[in-house]
Amino acid sequence: MGDNRWLKNSFVYLIILVAALALFFQYLGPGASQTEEKGIADVIADAQAGLVREIQAQAGDEQIIVTYNDGKKYRSRLESADSVMRLLADYGVPLRNEQGQRTINVIVQPAPAWGGLLSIFTILLPTLLLIGFFVFFMRQAQGSNNQAMSFGKSRARMFAGDKPTITFADVAGQEEAKQDLAEIVEFLKFPDKFAALGARIPRGVLMVGPPGTGKTLLSRAVAGEAGVPFFSISGSEFVEMFVGVGASRVRDLFDQAKRNAPCIVFIDEIDAVGRQRGAGLGGSHDEREQTLNQILVEMDGFDTNTNVIVIAATNRPDVLDPALVRPGRFDRQVVLDAPDVRGRIEILKVHVKGKPLAEDVNLEILARQTPGFSGADLMNVVNEAAILAARRSKRKISMAEFQDAVERVAIGGPERRSRVMTDRQKLVVAYHEAGHAIVGAALPKADKVQKVTIIPRGQAGGYTLFLPDEDSLNLRTVSQFKARLAVSLGGRVAEEIVFGNEEVTTGASGDLVQVTRIARAMVTRYGMSQRLGPIVFGEKEELIFLGREISEQRNYGDEVARQIDEEVHAIVSEAYETAQQILLQNRAVLDDMANALIEYETLDGEQLEELIRRVKPLTLDFSKSGSTTPNGRTEDRPAQPDAPQMGLGGPSPLPA
């Protein structure tokens, strides 16, 4: 594409035109003949001597072509605009002999219709070229100026509504959100129906939710269903290096929208420009605030009669300016969350359309294996499965490709079978992963073990996949948290039991980070400590739909901090003892599973179930624990969805 950029330059076309004219005059224009030139006096003398056979002339042209008796041709030029006949008569050149036969054949051709114009053009060509160069350079200078002035124009992309490409049929897994947005479609299609009852058309809809849940897709589906134009722009496209550009682009965007009303304006990632004024980590930002003020005026200012609906998407609703999200601007908030199992089935059905599937593919099983996956994750799973099937030269996508794709998306990265591991490393990783699996199988409150492997994938030397219960994604009990802590410590405990304290590796580093985070959250966030009570310690500012804390204000003293550390240590120690007790009771199963992993590298299905059935279950007694609550349940924010968990989250263990 970049190689053809020079074709768009008008200067190139000007050069081509000049070259074409030069070639025309050189080979096709007047005087293009290559015959030899002879003076008119010599021609008259030769004619008097009877050496000339024919003279060709053209009306209005001074040039003549003389043909001699021997066939040679010469060019000559008349001294004036007089005709050839008069010139020959003046010099007494006879055109006929005594017998009346013509001795010199004089041919006078009429002037061509374009000859005069061509002559005029030939004379004016240098002047036209100078004017052309002048206009060209003036336009270049004007273009540079217009480019600078175009900063104030909106960068929104418009999609016509007469040919919708996306409708509600293309969106699955968000039925409640579709119902809310279906009313927006009715507002756009039948505004009189609501106006007759005194209902006011909503000015805006704010869609909030984690990344990949379909906010942009739903907004385009609304435009497709309503059959109206759709303007799409990102919140970061408003503010530029020049002052006032953001407000100018907002005005231009809404001017375009009003000219195409009824229509939809979609602003993606509106938190980039709609952040609360005078707030944030960097303080105030005059240009961004000026842009936000213009958005506020356009959405609910003096001109409120336009049929333009603004749909905005963000995963940071907590930082938006209160004036932006008030009723009258964004009248509705539509929350999109990770789909449940029924939603995932419908999403998978949408994405597998047009793809050849093998007979063993079961979308319901696949949906149950992907709790916490967003719509974008499921789309990626289907695409990765298709890529794997093509790589394996298959004509249909089988369940094996879908299983590999789920692990690839959940853990990150392909299997690294080419990675060379020593026998010692394989042994350590095998016992580590077997420890995770056996502890998980022995605890009733733990997630179900789905697969154990020592094949490296991504940055993990091996991993254990657990299938969380759908009901536990939003609500976690104390027993579930403690079971998860014990499972996470199972790999470290297995290494200690088999190889001793001095031979424990760094393979459990990721597990220890996860254990510490969960235990501290139980004490400081969920109030699951009898010693400290149901109190939240520390005021946290969080990214609500991103699952990361960006700051925490400490609102407790040193003594309370010491007690928190003691409680966290007690919870982790209890989980460590639980994992140790389970593995000591099931040492034979631990050895057999580790040996099977070394031999087969991956255990799943019936082979894994046979080993798990031999594990002796253990029921935790929380009556003596110092970290329970009266009801034993707490709300777990959906900010950190539990995708299939892997036991070994960090780098592979170092050789002992």
UniProtKB/Swiss-Prot annotation:
Q: Where does Zn(2+) bind?
A: H432, H436, D511
Task: Return the annotated region ranges for Disordered.
Answer: 622-656
Q: What is the purpose of this protein?
A: Acts as a processive, ATP-dependent zinc metallopeptidase for both cytoplasmic and membrane proteins. Plays a role in the quality control of integral membrane proteins.
Residue intervals on the Cytoplasmic side? 1-10, 138-656
Task: Provide the cofactor list for this protein.
Answer: Zn(2+)
> Where does the UniProt annotation locate this protein?
Cell membrane
Similarity comment: In the central section; belongs to the AAA ATPase family.
Report the InterPro entries cross-referenced here: AAA+_ATPase, AAA_lid_3, ATPase_AAA_core, ATPase_AAA_CS, FtsH, P-loop_NTPase, Pept_M41_FtsH_extracell, Peptidase_M41
Membrane topology listed for this record: Multi-pass membrane protein
Q: Output the superkingdom of the source species.
A: Bacteria
The Enzyme Commission number assigned here is 3.4.24.-
List of catalytic residues = E433
Q: Name one GO molecular function term.
A: zinc ion binding
Specify the protein name: ATP-dependent zinc metalloprotease FtsH
Polar residues bias located where? Answer: 622-632
Picking any one GO biological process from the record gives: proteolysis
Q: List the disulfide bonds.
A: none
Where would you find the membrane-spanning parts of this chain? 11-31, 117-137
Q: What is its main location?
A: membrane
* Intervals, Extracellular compartment: 32-116
Q: Which organism is this protein's natural source?
A: Chloroflexus aggregans (strain MD-66 / DSM 9485)
One GO cellular component term: plasma membrane
**What keywords are assigned to this protein?**
ATP-binding, Cell membrane, Hydrolase, Membrane, Metal-binding, Metalloprotease, Nucleotide-binding, Protease, Transmembrane, Transmembrane helix, Zinc
Q: Where does ATP bind?
A: G209, P210, P211, G212, T213, G214, K215, T216
Q: Whom does it interact with, and what assembly results?
A: Homohexamer.
Q: How is the cofactor bound?
A: Binds 1 zinc ion per subunit.
